[in-house]
Each structure stands twice: as structure tokens, then as C-alpha cells.
Design a protein with these regions (language model features):
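Flexible "arm" and connector segments at domain edges
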Residues: 1-62, 68-195
Length: 195
């Protein structure tokens, strides 16, 4: 496949393309979190379809579309002075390292965490520093975990109910058409300057 350097160069190239589009493309200039949301939903559905078909060509294409949305939202976050793609990547890396305490992060390489409330202990585990902020962070992490478990249970229940009801192609197509219409309406509002 590709070397780490090639991957970094490709990511950097995509960042440059996305930044230029935001500056010079009339459609890209007008996009907001709200206007992009229907497109993100559609791209996510298309990725799921490709995954279900195990169509690697389409999976690669749809992953690119979803990645574009992650980068686009990060550009908007940067413009709002809140976060950028670096913050997104670092937060995700910190979260993954924290959620995998059985991995010794001191064993190979020079691993670090970007969150100032966290550090890698002598056992190689990512842990929170013992501060009031860290306690808040741990509480938020626990609340997030509980919320995620509850949402997963609700989703599983919903899917189980849906599985017991036969769905026909017409109802699926109708739902898909409604999503496409919402996207079209949102794009028309953005292009006309209506919020």
C-alpha cells in the first residue's frame, strides 16, 4: 500500500484542496453546519450501502465523501474559532488511547496525549491527572459512556421493531426520496441566501 509519508502528503493535499474550495467556490463558501447536515446524512447512507455490498471501489469513494465532510466541518469550526482538523484528530487519538488501557503506549515509539488533563503513566496507560478538571473530565466520560449505552440500547430496540415489520422497496425508496428532497431544498436555500 502506501508509506506513512505518502499518506500524510495525500492528507495535506486534501486539506489544501478543501481550503481552496472554501475560499473560491461559491457553493462551498455558503455552507454551514446546518446546510451540510442533509448531505452528510446522504453520504453516510451511501457509505453504508457500499459497505453492505462490499463494493471496495464504492467504499473508497464514499469514505472520501465522508472524510470531505469531516474536513469541511473542521474548516467551519476553525472559522468560528472553536477547533480545526488538528483538534479533531488529536481528540480522537486521545480518546482511543484512553479507551484501550490494555495497550502499553510506552512500549513502542514516543506516544503522547494532547489533552493537558491526561498523561501516560508508568504502566503505559492513558489516565487523567488528579485535578478538579480531570474529575470533571472523568465524570463527563462516564456520562458519555452511559449515554452511548442507552442510545445503543434504544437503537437496537428500534432495529428489532423494524426487523419485525416487513419493508418493501417502495417504502425504502420513498424515504430515500424524502432525504434527497430535503437536501435539494437545503441547497436551494443556501444558494438563494435564505437561512
Amino acid at each position: 500500500m502506501h508509506t506513512k509519508e505518502e499518506k500524510m502528503a495525500a492528507f495535506s493535499r486534501l486539506l489544501d484542496v478543501q481550503d481552496r474550495l472554501r475560499l473560491q467556490c461559491p457553493w462551498d463558501k455558503k455552507q454551514t453546519f446546518e446546510s451540510l447536515r442533509p448531505n452528510t446524512i446522504e453520504e453516510t447512507f451511501e457509505l453504508c450501502d457500499a459497505l453492505m455490498k462490499r463494493d471496495y471501489k464504492d467504499i473508497k469513494k464514499e469514505l472520501g465523501d465522508v472524510l470531505e465532510h469531516v474536513m469541511f466541518y473542521s474548516i467551519i469550526g476553525r472559522e468560528d474559532g472553536e477547533f480545526d482538523i488538528c483538534d479533531v484528530c488529536n481528540q480522537e487519538a486521545d480518546k482511543l488511547m484512553f479507551r484501550h488501557p490494555f495497550i502499553n503506549w510506552k512500549e513502542e515509539g514516543n506516544w503522547t496525549v494532547s489533552n493537558p488533563d491526561m498523561y501516560i503513566n508508568d504502566a503505559g496507560q492513558v489516565v487523567y491527572k488528579e485535578t478538579d478538571e480531570a474529575e470533571t473530565g472523568k465524570a463527563e466520560a462516564a456520562n458519555t459512556e452511559e449515554t452511548r449505552k442507552a442510545e445503543t440500547a434504544n437503537l437496537e430496540e428500534t432495529l428489532a421493531l423494524g426487523a419485525s415489520k416487513p419493508k418493501n422497496a417502495a417504502s425504502v425508496e420513498k424515504t430515500w426520496e424524502q432525504i434527497k428532497q430535503q437536501e435539494k431544498d437545503g441547497n436551494e436555500r443556501v444558494l438563494s441566501g435564505v437561512p
